[in-house]
Amino acid sequence: MDFPSEETTKTLVQKFDMVIFTCSYYSNLNDLRLQQCLKTLNDKSFGATIIPIVIVDGSPPEVHEFLKSNTKALVFKEQKKYGKGKGGALREAAMIAASLPGTTASTWLCWQEAEKSDMNRCWIKEVMNQNQPHDDIICPDRDDTCFKKSYPIEQYHSEMYGNHYLNCIMKKQLEDSTHSCRDIDWHFGPFAFRKKLLHLWLEYKGTSYDAQLIPIVAAIRKGYQVNSSIQVTFMLNEEMKNQEEGSLDFIEKRLNQLNDLDPKIKQFWSDPLYC
């Protein structure tokens, strides 16, 4: 499908003053996550014809062309202009999102994983109705009932543990600070920031999940307003839960995330600011 016109994109941006951006990689056309991504992009009520969605995709040519031709989202081939891995693709997508016609310094740039189809609804119906003019960053908080019901049970417990750990670290680090922040759902994934804070994400060079979260820590340390109190009734796709629950590979993936990501976040509270 062809990209929407600049005027159409501008109208979509200004409707909610937001842009969703994400990145993707699918090894083949049978990947369950590719189908979930298309659900995200093509939802009739909350998809790319309602909200501008930027996706930077690093899939093989056949998969990339399939994705691009089956949605009205703004699908770009990853150029690796901003580094390697998920982090580089995230920064590339953020830069494109910030460059869309109609965006201003206060426009919300909303990151989410492409497979989190229900998050589009949450942005429009829950987050954008509750954010405040003084908010700089939003870290949505999952409703616990929805979280526990829709996620693989192992992921529910690992992410709850990780959140408690990272919030304990944050409270300790802010004890003697003039800055404060409510508990954050660190391991959820989706977050949003005003376009004026784009530099916090572009200047951090992490290549994985740290590229999402370290800039949030930097923002807290610099005194920006982080709203982590907006609760969302997000439900993970049932097909993903069925694929992952009880799978040793996915259980070990969650364990590796805790052992790799969380220590990086802890360390950055003490490291010099990069920005």
Model regions and ranges:
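Short, well-formed alpha-helical segments that are part of the catalytic scaffolds
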Residues: 3-9, 22-46, 59-62
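C-terminal catalytic/acceptor-binding lobe
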Residues: 13, 209, 213-275
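Glycine-rich, basic loop-to-helix element that forms the pyrophosphate-binding segment
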Residues: 80-99
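Short, flexible, basic/aromatic active-site loop/helix in glycosyltransferases
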Residues: 136-184
